[in-house]
Regions:
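Short, linear, compositionally biased motifs with a strong N-terminal bias
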Residues: 13-16
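A residue-level marker of the well-folded mature domains of exported/periplasmic proteins
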Residues: 2-11, 21-247
Length: 247
């Protein structure tokens, strides 16, 4: 093979490699995912947490913002700071803005009962997370509070019930009274303890999801009941206060 022929072969091979490289570098399309991602571009998501400033909601927002940046949609957050009325106002304000998706994290089980259908009637997709209103939206992503409460109560029965050799004295530190966590969790507690009458509830008080308040309440309960067998809480953020209570 002459030098000129060799050059032509190498040039042709190089062209094929370059062409192949261009073809391979095209985004892979499985016929479904690309269309899904394309639909998200330019969409508006509105988020009303019960409050910002603690790990749970900050983590959710960080995840939303990261994905929004990657997929081309926007996330707007309005923080009611543990105030139910402020949450309702924020949600109504978002409905007027007509986002594509409204994400609600309900502090009060009843507060968004009108908000949810109102948003849906405007064509807004409503997603409720972790704590939902009585009225269902398009989707709920979160904890089954009845199941969790039931399992918690069963564990207390194992630790303090008739087969434990203990006295059965238990105290319950709940969150805010109108939250799904408390309302539904209490139903589960009652159902389990009804089947285990040896469990004696010596105190049930709300600490409003405040660790300092939980600490003070627990200290009082322990002083009044020094032989207490068990304490049942509803949220680890609040329970950090319970755990350091003084006797």
């Amino acid at each position: 093979m002459t030098g000129m022929k060799l050059f032509k072969v190498l040039a042709a091979t190089a062209a094929l490699v370059v062409t192949a490289g261009v073809a391979v570098s095209e985004p892979y399309d499985d016929g479904q995912s690309k269309g899904y991602y394309d639909v998200l571009k330019g969409k508006k998501v509105a988020f009303v947490p019960l409050s910002m400033g603690f790990d749970l909601t900050e983590g959710w927002n960080a995840g939303l913002q990261n994905q929004a940046k990657a997929l081309g949609y926007t996330v707007d957050v309005r923080d009611p700071n543990w105030n139910v009325e402020a949450g309702v106002q924020a949600a109504n304000g978002f409905i007027a803005d007509k986002p594509d998706v409204l994400i609600l994290h309900a502090l009060d089980q009843q507060a968004y009962n009108r908000i949810v259908p109102k948003a849906m009637s405007e064509g807004i997709n409503v997603v409720q997370i972790n704590m939902k209103s009585v009225t269902n939206g398009d989707a709920f992503v979160g904890t089954d509070w009845y199941e969790m409460g039931y399992k918690q109560a069963e564990e207390i029965v194992k630790a303090c019930g008739k087969d434990s050799g203990k006295n059965g004295k238990v105290a319950i530190i709940t969150g805010q009274a109108s939250t799904p966590t408390t309302v539904i969790g209490n139903m589960a507690f009652d159902d389990v303890f009804a089947q285990n009458p040896e469990i004696q509830i010596v105190a049930k008080q709300a600490a409003d999801f405040d660790p300092a308040k939980a600490q003070a309440i627990t200290s009082t309960i322990l002083k009044q009941n020094p032989d207490l067998c068990g304490l049942l809480g509803v949220w680890d953020g609040q329970d950090t206060g319970t755990a350091v209570a003084d006797i």
